[in-house]
Every structure is written in structure tokens, then in C-alpha cells.
């Protein structure tokens, strides 16, 4: 995978340990501290970028908002999800993510999300834009995704196995055939019942 990323022009940064013992699940957030990065998105390593993600990110860039957030599954109903946000350089005020995370829990399940909800969200909630397919009425500055969901129910943040097959339980059990709230559909596309 590393060689594929390099071939595509990705910059690879190896992390073998950090001062303050920042938990590994927080490492992906450290891009927010990098002064050489102007804009970034954080995604889980087991998800894949897709067109829906791309068009949402493009809409965020045009908006001028500091932080971008995605909620594209019924289980994404949180202020922020660990692998579905992004930002611009300088949008998260000092101290750095590394310093804040060093004082937070380590690699326990959900600690990354609790960190974002408790520590980062209060700092950025007024200068963020969220694309939200299910809970757009619960959080500030939320809006529908700019594209209709694919017929295969693919979603931003969807988990894939190492053979590139999607984890179908996330789709079949929670999304397939379940209409979303009309408030979370674009005004001119109320027919996007699985938006």
C-alpha cells in the first residue's frame, strides 16, 4: 500500500512514537499541526475516497469555512467522527493537537471521537461546515450532501476490507431501503429519499 501511495505522489510520514505518548489513533489528526500543510482531510485507512466525498470537500473549500465535517451513515450522528473531517492550516488554535492528545486517553475504542467531541468541537463548531445525510437538524452549519447517494448505497467513511470489498453489514443493516429525513435532502431534490 505504501508503494502505491508513493506512486500516486503521496507524501509518506512515518510515525514510530511521539513525545508525550500520543496514542496511535490520534496520529492521523497531527496533520492539523503541520505548518507545511495548507488544507487536509482525515479519513480512516480502511475507507476509500469516492465521488460523494470529493464533491462535498469541493463545496467546503468554496465555503471558506475552517473545518469540514461529514456524517453520511446513521451511525455517524456525532459532532465529529475520527475519519471524516478536515481543515485548513491554523484553524485549530494552540496548543497543538499533539499537546492536547497527550493529555487525553490513549488507544481505547472511541477515544479519538471523544477527543474530537470534548476538546476540538467546542473550538471549531462556529467555523465549520458539515455535510450530513441523517442528522442535519441536530448540529450547526449542517447541510445536505451535494450529490445523490449511489444506487449501491456507498457512503463517505464506508469501511472496506483488504480485498477492497465493502463491509456490507454497514449498508444492509443500517442504510439499504431506509429513507432519510426530508430536512437532510437538498431543497431542490426532495426526491433523493436515500440522500
Task: Annotate each predicted stretch with a short phrase.
Residues 1-39, 48:
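Active-site-proximal specificity loops/subdomain of glycosyltransferases
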Residues 8, 63-64, 122-126:
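Structured helix-beta-strand junction loops
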Residues 20, 48-80:
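Conserved donor-nucleotide/metal-binding helix-loop-beta segment in metal-dependent transferases, i.e.
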Residues 25, 29, 54, 112-114:
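Conserved glycosyltransferase catalytic-site signature
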Residues 45:
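Active-site acidic catalytic loop and adjacent metal/ATP-binding pocket
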Residues 69, 73-77, 84-195:
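Catalytic core and acceptor-binding pocket of nucleotide-sugar-dependent glycosyltransferases
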Amino acid at each position: 500500500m505504501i508503494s502505491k501511495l508513493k506512486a500516486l505522489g503521496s507524501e509518506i510520514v512515518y510515525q514510530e512514537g511521539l513525545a508525550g505518548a500520543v496514542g496511535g489513533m490520534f496520529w492521523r489528526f497531527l496533520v492539523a499541526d503541520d505548518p507545511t500543510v495548507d488544507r487536509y482531510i482525515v479519513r480512516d485507512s480502511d475507507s476509500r475516497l469516492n465521488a460523494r466525498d470529493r464533491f462535498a470537500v469541493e463545496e467546503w473549500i468554496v465555503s471558506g469555512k475552517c473545518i469540514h465535517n461529514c456524517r453520511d451513515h446513521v451511525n455517524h450522528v456525532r459532532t465529529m467522527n475520527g475519519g471524516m473531517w478536515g481543515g485548513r492550516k491554523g484553524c485549530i488554535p494552540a496548543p497543538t493537537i499533539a499537546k492536547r492528545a497527550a493529555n487525553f486517553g490513549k488507544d481505547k475504542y472511541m477515544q479519538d471521537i471523544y477527543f474530537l467531541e470534548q476538546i476540538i468541537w467546542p473550538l471549531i463548531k462556529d467555523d465549520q461546515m458539515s455535510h450530513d445525510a441523517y442528522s442535519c437538524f441536530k448540529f450547526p452549519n449542517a447541510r445536505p450532501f451535494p450529490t445523490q447517494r449511489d444506487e449501491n448505497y456507498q457512503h463517505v467513511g464506508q469501511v472496506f476490507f483488504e480485498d477492497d470489498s465493502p463491509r456490507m453489514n454497514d449498508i444492509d443493516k443500517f442504510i439499504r431501503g431506509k429513507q432519510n429525513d426530508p430536512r437532510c435532502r437538498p431543497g431542490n431534490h426532495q426526491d433523493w429519499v436515500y440522500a
